[in-house]
Amino acid sequence: MDCKIEIIPRLLHFKQPAGTSRVVYTTRKVWYLHLTSPDYPGRTGIGECAPLPALSCDDLPDYEDILAGACRRLEQCGGELDADALRDYPSILFGLETALRHLLTGSWALYDTDFSQGKAGIPINGLIWMGDFDTMLSRIEEKMAAGFRCIKLKIGAIGFEEELALLRHIRAHFSSREIELRVDANGAFSPADAMEKLKRLSELELHSIEQPIRAGQWEEMARLAADSPLPIALDEELIGCNTPEGKRKLLSAINPQYIVLKPSLHGGICGGNEWIAEAEKRHIGWWITSALESNIGLNAIAQWCATFDNPLPQGLGTGLLFTDNVEMPLEVRKDCLWFCNDDI
């Protein structure tokens, strides 16, 4: 297949700062790929490459050169994607995978599912970004009023006692049967105090905690996963672990209760499929999360997510992060993300 790819950089602006225990984002740079081919006249396949600064394994000074080279190779290979050659560049792989898929389907409905047909929504968690106590409390109450049954809080920045107070506030009004609570520490705890904090958090009947300690401490993380009364989900731990053998080693060494998959960070669609296969062999649960992509990337992740029969609330965005997002037939109804098939 003859093909051409145009690379279009774009700077997106957050409606409000997105804060974790590590960093606060106010803008977001992404690269859109526009793929065309005379074999598919009138069509353009669009993908999004969106490495996260200071987090993605492919957040590199020469990223644009690497991206341009990958696009040239796809053109030279007649549209045949060499996924193995791009294992170390998951955001580029994800962008190319989804651009190809969009070109071939000719629709934003990238896979044939009940979601893509507008028959079913995907349950999602309501995400509460870092802020001061009053701001976070207000956001929590907004999410609960909107109908979210799973709330995820970013913790590790405003003080552990204040964060416990927020969680207690929710539990004072809603039981664990009514509202599922997840927390994400983004590696904020130290190995020395992590277990004590996990014990205190577990008293509030939380579903899980993502990445309690910094990535790369396999022995300490394995100990927490084995002994913690609160289930542990790996997130940042998966970044840079790009080979099948590496994935097997990590999961066998730590044996977490869950893993959280972000295609832009964890190997694109094909890498995500590898993670899921290895996790399920070990009876490790998983869910899929977007990573501050615009609606182009969010739609691609949601379309892929819908191909699985996973009943857990997913960590997909709402499409409302940016002031200058791309229009996409996505809509949040109560606590589900829907694809509005009538709009395509």
Residue spans for each PLM region:
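N-terminal capping/lid subdomain adjacent to the active-site entrance of alpha/beta enzymes
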Residues: M1-L181, N186-A188, A192-M195, R200-S202, ...
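Short, loop-centered acidic/histidine patches that primarily coordinate divalent metals
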Residues: R10, T36, A50, S264, ...
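Enriched - but not universal
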Residues: H34, I66, D132, M221, ...
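A short pocket-lining beta-strand/turn micro-motif at the edge of beta-sheets
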Residues: C71, E80-D82, Q257, R282-I288, ...
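Long, contiguous hydrophobic alpha-helical segments, chiefly transmembrane helices and signal peptides
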Residues: I124, I155, I288, I296, ...
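Catalytic core of soluble alpha/beta enzymes
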Residues: I158-N299, Q303-C305, F322-R333
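Short helix/strand-capping turn motifs
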Residues: D309-Q314, T318-L320
